[in-house]
Curated annotation (Swiss-Prot):
<feature type="modified residue" description="N5-methylglutamine">
    <location>
        <position position="251"/>
    </location>
</feature>
<dbReference type="GO" id="GO:0005737">
    <property type="term" value="C:cytoplasm"/>
</dbReference>
<keyword id="KW-0488">Methylation</keyword>
<dbReference type="InterPro" id="IPR045853">
    <property type="entry name" value="Pep_chain_release_fac_I_sf"/>
</dbReference>
<dbReference type="InterPro" id="IPR000352">
    <property type="entry name" value="Pep_chain_release_fac_I"/>
</dbReference>
<dbReference type="Pfam" id="PF00472">
    <property type="entry name" value="RF-1"/>
</dbReference>
<keyword id="KW-0648">Protein biosynthesis</keyword>
<dbReference type="Pfam" id="PF03462">
    <property type="entry name" value="PCRF"/>
</dbReference>
<dbReference type="GO" id="GO:0075523">
    <property type="term" value="P:viral translational frameshifting"/>
</dbReference>
<comment type="similarity">
    <text>Belongs to the prokaryotic/mitochondrial release factor family.</text>
</comment>
<keyword id="KW-0963">Cytoplasm</keyword>
<protein>
    <recommendedName>
        <fullName>Peptide chain release factor 2</fullName>
    </recommendedName>
</protein>
<comment type="function">
    <text>Peptide chain release factor 2 directs the termination of translation in response to the peptide chain termination codons UGA and UAA.</text>
</comment>
<dbReference type="InterPro" id="IPR004374">
    <property type="entry name" value="PrfB"/>
</dbReference>
<dbReference type="InterPro" id="IPR005139">
    <property type="entry name" value="PCRF"/>
</dbReference>
<dbReference type="GO" id="GO:0016149">
    <property type="term" value="F:translation release factor activity, codon specific"/>
</dbReference>
Amino acid sequence: MELVEVKQELAAMAKRLTDFRGSLDLEAKQERMAELDEFMTAPDFWDDQEAAQTVINESNGLKEQVNVFLELEEKYENLEVSYELVKEEADEELEKELEAGVKELISRLNDFELQLLLSEPYDKNNAILELHPGAGGTESQDWASMLLRMYTRWSEQRGFKVETMDYLPGDEAGVKSVTLLIKGHNAYGYLKAEKGVHRLVRISPFDSSGRRHTSFVSCEVMPELDDNVEIDIRTEDLKVDTYRASGAGGQHINTTDSAIRITHLPTNTVVTCQSERSQIKNRDQAMKMLKAKL
């Protein structure tokens, strides 16, 4: 990269940072952070743990966004200094460092811009992701397990926490259905575009004739909603079933009827949860999933 190109890239980055600062409204965000910090120091802050966690998540999200932006600005200023030094006196080693720094900052600015674009009402929420294989038996179930590994690894690489809410293993391989709760700032914003039917065409390892098979898996993505979102669900509209948990888990698996299945009769919407030892906790999680679906 020539010095002329470096200068052009630095000018473009300066404009982007100015635009970001304008859209971020740093002063308003810093005021909100101060408000949240005050809430968190209140003696009764932990009386309502769910509300407390919502405040903590909002605070962490704001702090991360503001701190990352300030870090990007500092990185840009350092690159400007390096550029001036190289312009005054040629230094091959410093030129290489400058070029690498410019490329890295461009990449980080692109990531930051994507985060700013995730500004829809529920983008910042945790995500509930469901995978359901289509017709095709073991072949589709194996494809579902591949997608499960992909989403799990992607989430872990981004620093998100993954919890398995419901898991039904396949008869020979793969999974018949799985529901994940993916926790992290902007988890739903990043994952919402994954909703739809995912198709795989391959020579099947389960077909002794080596024929080509097409497999389908439907993917549902919903935001996890907190109690601030009011959805009227009447008790008489619900059918609640309990059953024994299955799949990977602790000692409670297959020993108690801790798993919950809730059917919303007017819409025939069904949700299941078996991730917790407690039937009460599974019911709470299932109700959150039902609210998200409705």
